[in-house]
């Protein structure tokens, strides 16, 4: 195993701690760059969604993972970004301008949400962000002169340097990938700056942070604004990818999906946002695959274990009927959330770290390394 | 004026349902500092249980009602055992996520079992109306109001006058200290979940004649019950009901007097206003942390 010998703070905050990182991330980048020429168009489309979800995931990580402010209202920020883009595009504003404008506006609204949120903690903050999202959703449905109400808005393809970029083509994918990579690098830099350290300090203990001279209010508002702005950028891409937006796309359901992204990925590292996004976006094609192919496979297994043709066909039709039940996807979602919270609280990235550590320490790995400590906190009401 | 009273009564009836769901939130919150996002879905499930007993198996209304309450109390214990107990003592956010997951699961599974249609339970008070002058009050709405008042009173007495209630309050203040004092915290939490599921079932059954039972009813009403619980101060039993009634009245008044669209938003606007001006709610306790 490799020991990193650090002699000063600069060593500690390097983006690439050792040369191995260049190799692995270089390889990853190469794979991502050739992906559009290899994968099917459906998978490419899913990959674009992975980029968008991961961008939102990173935004949410800044707020929830690193500043400790839970939010169940990020669908509203996404909606604001998407609608700003659609509205400005209608008046012939070029893409780079409305892209930035959407982020700026969403960031501003995020800051405005952040101010009232200063007084709120824990569950109250969650409820307040839910209410904010509801109000935004209703405004989008009612403000018909701008948002076209429930009929929704169409949004034309991105035009970069006078060339229209198809939403299914590789160029759009590269655009989303670029936004994601820039977001991740920007966030990494943010997190190793004084601002990022203040965020983490606020997450770990607000009282302690304040007594160390951190302006808690300022940094909370900053965190909200930055998180919202990034979500706004993602919203522009989201709108372009779907080419049609309407208020009912930006419901609580979507906010919960974003939370699931970071919960499943892991809330303590930016890797989590990407892994979680892959999981959430890819679960759809996976379930479709299960629905289509699983009955046949199970019938095949039944047949090999000596079941007659009649019985195998019977099994196949039963499984098919079960797989096409209406709410199955929701049930699987629910089970996945509960299982992750119960058994893998550090998320997929935590699992990856555990596996890595297992091989690094091979015979000496012990499970207690990652054991969560129970804190039977005193009442939050006395906080 | 007559319109106003009519709106007021239907607002109060609706508000009582919110209040009953909010009661469930408050009970669980009081005992464990956990916010149960699946509370609305427990209500929905209770309604479906009652529908199964009464509508499908043809039992007497009261027998079916009691059966549904008992079944749901057991189910509440089960849900607590499986989903909440293993993560008790961990950050609140993970528990919230777990209950959101539970809610998803319950919604989908009940959609699979009972289908996605609207169901109606025939109750003894479905038909009758009470006439006071030219005011017409439906019995089903009055039944909701009466049941809420009774339940609220019973629960308040339970929490403040019985030993078990005191144990629950103690474990909510400080779980570890309560444990040291000989309170079986795990069993207490389990009982709280049973009670809150039972209360949710009452809400579901009483609600059935008013809004019907379908698999999404819990989500819709559960989210409306949040403003109620916050308005009353998360953690106060009378507060939950008062908050629920206020939210119900605000909603029905906004639907009647304000432009279209306000009806759905008004509770949340009120909620945000309350959070900004008086985050501890109307009946809440607020103590600053002393270092």
Regions found by a protein language model. Name each.
Chain B
Residues 14, 136-214, 237-243:
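Helix-loop-helix "hairpin" substructures at the membrane interface of multi-pass membrane proteins
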Residues 18, 22, 58-70, 190-271:
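Transmembrane alpha-helical segments in multi-pass inner-membrane proteins
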Residues 38, 62-63, 93-94, 163, ...:
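Residues that define the loop-to-transmembrane-helix transition and helix capping
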Residues 58-102, 109, 242-247, 278-279:
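Alpha-helical transmembrane segments within multi-pass membrane transporters and channels
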Residues 86-161, 188, 253, 258, ...:
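Transmembrane helix-bundle core of multi-pass membrane transporters
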């Amino acid at each position: 195993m490799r020991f990193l010998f650090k002699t000063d703070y600069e060593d500690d905050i390097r983006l690439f701690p050792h040369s191995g990182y260049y190799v692995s991330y270089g390889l990853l980048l190469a794979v991502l760059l050739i992906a559009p020429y290899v994968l099917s168009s459906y998978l490419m489309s899913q990959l674009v969604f992975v980029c968008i979800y991961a961008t939102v995931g990173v935004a949410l990580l800044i707020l929830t993972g690193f500043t400790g402010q839970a939010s169940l209202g990020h669908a509203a920020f996404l909606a604001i970004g998407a609608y700003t883009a659609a509205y400005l595009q209608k008046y012939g504003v070029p893409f780079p301008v409305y892209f930035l404008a959407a982020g700026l506006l969403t960031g501003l609204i995020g800051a405005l949400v952040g101010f009232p949120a200063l007084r709120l903690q824990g569950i109250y903050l969650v409820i307040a962000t839910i209410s904010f999202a509801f109000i935004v959703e209703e405004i989008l449905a009612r403000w018909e002169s701008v948002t076209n109400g429930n009929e929704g808005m169409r949004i034309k393809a991105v035009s970069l340097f006078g060339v229209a970029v198809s939403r299914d083509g590789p160029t759009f994918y590269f655009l989303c990938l670029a936004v994601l990579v820039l977001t991740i690098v920007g966030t990494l830099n943010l997190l190793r700056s004084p601002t990022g350290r203040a965020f983490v300090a606020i997450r770990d203990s607000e009282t302690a942070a304040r007594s160390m001279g951190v302006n808690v209010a300022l940094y909370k508002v900053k965190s909200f604004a930055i998180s919202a702005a990034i979500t706004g950028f993602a919203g522009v891409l989201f709108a372009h990818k779907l080419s049609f937006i309407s208020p009912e796309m930006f419901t609580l359901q979507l906010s919960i999906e974003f939370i699931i992204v970071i919960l499943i990925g892991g809330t303590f590292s930016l890797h989590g946002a990407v892994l979680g996004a892959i999981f959430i976006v890819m679960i759809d094609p996976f379930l479709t695959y299960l629905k289509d192919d699983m009955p046949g496979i199970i019938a095949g297994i039944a047949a090999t274990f000596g079941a007659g043709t009649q019985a195998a066909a019977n099994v196949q039709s039963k499984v098919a009927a079960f797989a096409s039940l209406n709410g199955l996807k929701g049930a699987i979602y629910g089970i996945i959330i509960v299982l992750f919270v119960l058994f893998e609280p550090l998320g997929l990235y935590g699992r990856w770290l555990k596996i890595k550590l297992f091989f690094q320490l091979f015979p000496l790995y012990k499970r207690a390394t990652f054991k969560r400590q129970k804190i039977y906190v005193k009442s939050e009401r006395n906080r | 004026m007559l319109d106003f009273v009519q709106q007021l009564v239907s607002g109060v009836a609706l508000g009582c349902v919110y209040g009953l769901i909010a009661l469930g939130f408050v009970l669980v919150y009081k005992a464990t500092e956990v916010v149960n996002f699946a509370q609305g879905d427990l209500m929905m499930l209770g309604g479906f249980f009652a529908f199964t007993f009464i509508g499908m198996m043809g039992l007497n209304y009261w027998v079916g009602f009691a059966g549904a309450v008992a079944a749901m109390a057991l189910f509440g214990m089960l849900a607590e055992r499986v989903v909440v107990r293993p993560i008790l003592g961990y950050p609140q956010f993970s528990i919230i996520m777990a209950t959101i997951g539970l809610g998803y699961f319950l919604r989908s599974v009940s959609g699979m079992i009972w289908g996605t249609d609207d169901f109606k339970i025939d109750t003894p008070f479905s038909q009758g109306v009470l006439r006071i002058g030219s005011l017409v009050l439906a019995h089903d709405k009055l039944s909701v109001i009466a049941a809420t008042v009774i339940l609220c009173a019973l629960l308040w007495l339970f929490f403040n006058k019985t030993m078990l209630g005191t144990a629950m309050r103690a474990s909510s203040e400080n779980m570890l200290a309560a444990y040291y004092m000989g309170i079986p915290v795990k069993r207490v939490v389990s009982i709280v979940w049973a009670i809150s599921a039972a209360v949710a079932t009452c809400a579901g059954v009483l609600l059935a004649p008013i809004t019907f039972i379908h698999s999404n009813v819990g989500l819709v009403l559960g989210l409306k019950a949040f403003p109620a619980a916050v308005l009353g101060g998360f953690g106060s039993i009378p507060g939950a009901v008062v908050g629920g009634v206020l939210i119900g009245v605000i909603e029905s008044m906004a639907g009647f007097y304000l432009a279209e669209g306000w009806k759905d938003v008004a509770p949340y606007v009120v909620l945000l206003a309350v959070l900004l001006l008086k985050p501890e709610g109307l009946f809440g306790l607020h103590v600053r942390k002393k270092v």
